[in-house]
Amino acid sequence: MDNYEILETIHKSKTGETIVFKVKEKNKKTCDKVYALKLIGELNNRFQKLMFKREVDALKTLNSCNGIVKIRDYVLNAEFDGKNDCGLILLDYVGGTNLEEVELNQFSQIEKYELCLKIFKAIEEAHNNNVLHRDIKPSNIMYNVETKEVKIIDFGTSKIKSIVEQETTLPFYSQNFSAPEVVKGNSTTEASDIYSLGAVMFFVLFNMLPNGTKMICKTMDDLGTTEILKNLISKMVAEEPENRFQELAPVIDIVEDLIGDNKPQKDTYLCSVDIKKVELFKENFINRK
């Protein structure tokens, strides 16, 4: 991808194995289009390269999904900063603010529900395409305050990173938002993503970091949360995967109901009209004239 110019570094992992740059095409002075270029490497053997390609190809199937950042291209065997055989992924650059930095206390309750609904629908589309995120957390959710658009980033790349990171003894999970089975090093499933979404919903609604199932449930009890909301989040973040929702469709239905219940209702008045009395009134009015 020599035809792209690096504008700035957006992110660099602690090990330095993953770097994200903001880039633009060279020799296109009139074009303001920018992209995100993710470098992952080195891919030291055939197995790592095969897994990298398989994962990126799977993620490209999400390009038609709403709310998910799109992959434009990728390269194997790239050279960067003295490293050979690096993997490069070119993605759409997503503006806005990540959810970790959004002023959620400025949102109304219904706006918070609508935000969660957009996130859930994006992840549902991915699940319907047999792709898991594996690292759902506020910093991987971008929000545009003006357009209210939501974009999920870093989609599925936690598995790619786990293939190439040198410090393989480090667990790949996010504090506060990963499911218990993921923290223990077990396989990620749809139920694991649903746990993370429940933790994100708790973060959005209550503006505090979740810290495990017990803390989430106790906080909701202490705050007098409504039964429907408490039951929803509690089931999403259940300790055991089998006790959670196994798909997002029922979660989305409940959130849509919550939005409907919280929307201000316009007053509607029903009345019946006696036509004979109306005609009599008209006659009396005319006679008075």
Outline where the language-model segments fall.
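Conserved activation segment of eukaryotic-like protein kinases, specifically the C-terminal portion
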Residues: 168-182
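Conserved HxN/HPN-centered segment at the entrance to the catalytic loop
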Residues: 64-76
